[in-house]
Amino acid sequence: MTTTDGSHSLDSSVAHGSVPYGWQRKRLKELCESVQTGPSVRGADRGRTQADGDVPIVLPRDLRGHRVVTEDAEAVPAMPRERAGALERYMLREGDILVARTGTVGRLALVTGEHTGWLYHHGLVRLRLPAQGPAHAAYLAVYLGSEATQNWMRARSAGSVIPSVSTRTLGELPVLLPPATEQQTIGETLAALDEKVRVHSEIARVTGEYRRTLAEALLAGAFTVTP
């Protein structure tokens, strides 16, 4: 069945639709070594940042354009190393996928080597794939970011004030998997386009800031304009 917002079309297409030759139908939990929510931060640890030399924490707001994008070290929350040592199972490694489970449900990022060893916020879910599993991380990341998948997650979000989706529900997400070589090609192609979008968005942002600064200076007579 397809709803007006497409929220159930993913279930229908994966469960009952035709699948191209060589493709597979799987549930997300079948593809992952673990589907794990991040640890809670104790009140005593609040206020510490990466600049203090502690272990930094990825926040939901850091998931932008399928990447982890953090602010200056002084703005990145962190956990004392002595406590972080007991949370090794929560430390990120390259190829992990982070998904926001509260607030803006479905926001996601593919973790790169830059953030290996970081921790992640309890408002995020980490998907860790087995080394020899059937799913390619880059492909799964773009699949999770597709409109149909995002609609599926939003439709299953609970809470009228702050939407949230459970790890159990997320694990039931239906996934279509092409052969490994196709997964790699699809993932790399769309990831390259995501990077182009990110770069152009940054250019637009910087240009906008320059325009505002220049306009204020010109309108205040800070520069002499020659016709």
Model-identified regions with their sequence ranges:
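Short, surface-exposed loop/turn microsegments at beta-strand edges and helix-strand junctions
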Residues: R46-V55, T70-P77, Y90-L92, L110-G123
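A short glycine-rich beta-alpha junction/loop motif
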Residues: W118-G123, G159-T185
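Short, charged/polar surface micro-motifs in flexible loops or helix N-caps
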Residues: L63-H66, A84, I97, T104-G106, ...
